[in-house]
Amino acid sequence: NFVEEHRSFFEPLHPSFFELTTAMAFRYFADQKVDVAVIEVGMGGRLDCTNIIHPDLCVITNIGLDHTQYLGDTLTKIAKEKAGIIKEGVPVVIGRAQGAVKRVFTMKAKEKNAPIEYARENARYWDMEIVPYSKLQEIRPMMDNTIQSMHEMIEAMDEQSEEEANQMRQALLMLDLSDSLRTLDQILDKRKDAIKIHNEMFPFGLFTELSGAYQFENMFTILKALATLTRLNYNIRSQDYRAGLANVCQLTGLMGRWQKVHSYPDIICDTGHNVDGIEYIHVQLNAIHKTFDQEIHIVFGMVSDKDISSVLELLPKDATYYFTKASVKRAMPEDELMKMALEA
């Protein structure tokens, strides 16, 4: 109905599939009267069709060499395109950025009078680690024991000082341990590895079902963005942090991000397709290989407009490879991919 209603407007413009579906999404959000819409840029930023909105917050994630034929062949050129989403007076959070890339964002934010924050600036206040499923199973009873000990302390205090006991009860409420247990149980039910994030605010940790090493950078960006939204009077509670991070895939439909699709043997699916993404995958594969001395088998395919040679150079040399071609026009034939791999 949407397309038919607006056909006379759209046809002279010859919109792309992405432009048309973006317009449909905006209409759907408006009709549903959503409280918050998270709009992801399709590519770049400055010229992207999503760049007509006036948001409460802009977020620019980590800059990598991708879509170089459209955005430019250097990180600085790509950063200038990304910086095009920075709006007059609208706060902006930047993921990993340094050197010339950071200067691009800083200058653009100054030009637009936009408050700017870098996610990495507060990284020292957060500890993060990848926790295997087996280790998560050990953490669960430890948390139970901690809660039990605190309740026993409160009961003992009640006999001596009601005021101190009430203070301890308040501290227990602030820690919100029952909610921590609930979200940990949700991840345990999925039989997944997790990333544990903790600091003074969350001493028993936040757990996210995303366990790719590259998610560390994303977590810093998320936490900074949530803190900024809180300052903008968004009512984001500690249990919202926990529930959101523990159920990312269910809430968003996210797939293919270091996604374990089978155990014994472990089968992991990842859609990394540029040098930055593959570097993280390479590090994590090496860690698995060294820790568990497991053989690695890789089913590998790419589209032809990516920097395939640079990606192949990063992949482990001692793995067994199965080259494949996806059912899309841009996919590189498997025999050509294998030839490039042998030369890498």
What are the functions of these language-model segments?
Residues 45-47, 54-112:
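Conserved catalytic-core segment of NTP-binding enzymes
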Residues 125-129, 137, 141, 188-202:
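Acidic-glycine-rich active-site phosphate/pyrophosphate-binding loop
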Residues 136, 143, 147-150, 165-168, ...:
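Generic L/I/V-rich hydrophobic alpha-helical segments across diverse proteins
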Residues 156-166:
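Charged, low-complexity interaction regions
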Residues 95-96, 110-136, 185-186, 209-212, ...:
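Beta-strand->loop->alpha-helix junctions that form or flank phosphate-binding loops
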Residues 31, 36-41, 49-51, 55-59, ...:
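Nucleotide phosphate-binding/pyrophosphate-handling subdomain across enzymes
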Residues 98-104, 108, 192, 266-268, ...:
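C-terminal helical cap/extension that packs against the catalytic core
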